[in-house]
UniProtKB/Swiss-Prot annotation:
SUPFAM superfamilies: Ferredoxin reductase-like, C-terminal NADP-linked domain, Riboflavin synthase domain-like. This is Ferredoxin--NADP reductase A. FAD binds at residues 52-55, 118. CDD domains: FNR1.
């Protein structure tokens, strides 16, 4: 047993593409987290823990843990992790942390969850939280990727979550899913910043433009997207929040190459919630 970690058993492995995969594992009864947080996860290699920061794609009321990962060519961890099989074990850190929790936002009417690539992971946790729908009148989750096939969880967000026996009734009238692609033909093309600046996203969803009086946002994805979107929001009067002071929008810096959390020891080359410019 590695101090500070529990050993969890892999229950399911799903390969979305040659570059994206999801793991589901057992969950220690003692492991607690807030929806939107991340923890350290990895393997024992040569007798030592090899771990990276991973957002939890599962909700805190679920009995299993879920992780959404890219496959980094020659990445020390993901080059091994992508070949893991059901029944094998992984390490999961005993402590979760992170900025992307609804408690770090001021009260508002519409919650926007803006993701690129595997930055979708923490928002999968947030949209499965009943409290999210108690606090906000509308929830919009956007996912921008390079290719259509990279839009992992699209069916889940478009259909399956709304049909969920426990959550469907509160999700259906409030959740909107807005995917976009940057390098292929698709019904919605373009980077999320361009779609926000042009007003296309607001026209498509029949919603008003962003207003700091009632809109709240969370951002997770590539460092370029985070910087560009934060600048766009700041120019419109939005104030960034953190774990100490709630704000109008939140950025998970643990995966952005800045103000790295003590738990986020992932190197930029293998950061699990980073995707390149979409």
């Amino acid at each position: 047993m590695v101090p500070g970690y529990t050993e969890e058993t892999v229950l399911e492995v799903h390969h979305w593409t040659d570059k994206l995969f999801t793991l589901k594992t057992t969950r220690s009864p003692s492991f607690r987290f807030a929806n939107g947080q991340f923890c350290m996860m990895g393997l024992v290699v040569a007798g030592k823990p090899l771990v990276r920061a991973y957002s939890l794609a599962s909700a805190n009321h679920e009995e299993t843990l879920e992780f959404f990962s890219i496959k980094v060519p020659n990445g020390p961890l993901t080059s091994r992790l992508q070949h893991i099989a059901v029944g094998e074990t992984i390490l999961v850190g005993k402590r979760a942390t992170g900025t992307l929790t609804i408690g770090n936002l001021r009260p508002g009417r519409t919650l926007w969850l803006l993701a690129t690539g595997t930055g979708l992971a923490p928002f999968l946790s947030v949209v499965k939280d009943p409290e999210t729908y108690e606090r906000f009148e509308r929830v919009v989750i956007t996912h921008t990727c390079r290719r259509v096939q990279d839009l992992a969880y699209a069916r889940y967000l478009e259909h399956e979550l709304a049909a969920d026996e426990l959550l469907g009734e509160i999700v259906r009238p409030k959740l909107r899913y807005y995917p976009s692609v940057t390098r292929e033909a698709f019904k919605t093309e373009g980077r999320i910043t361009a779609l926000l600046e042009s007003g296309r996203i607001f026209a498509d969803l029949a919603l008003p433009a962003l207003d700091p009086a009632h809109d709240r946002l969370m951002l997770c994805g590539s460092s370029e997207m985070l910087a560009d979107t934060a600048a766009l929001l700041e120019a419109r009067g939005f104030e960034e929040g953190n774990s100490g002071e709630p704000g109008d929008y939140l950025v998970e810096k643990a995966f952005a190459g800045e103000k790295r959390s003590p738990l986020a020891s992932a190197s930029p080359a293998e950061s699990t919630n980073l995707s390149g410019p979409a």
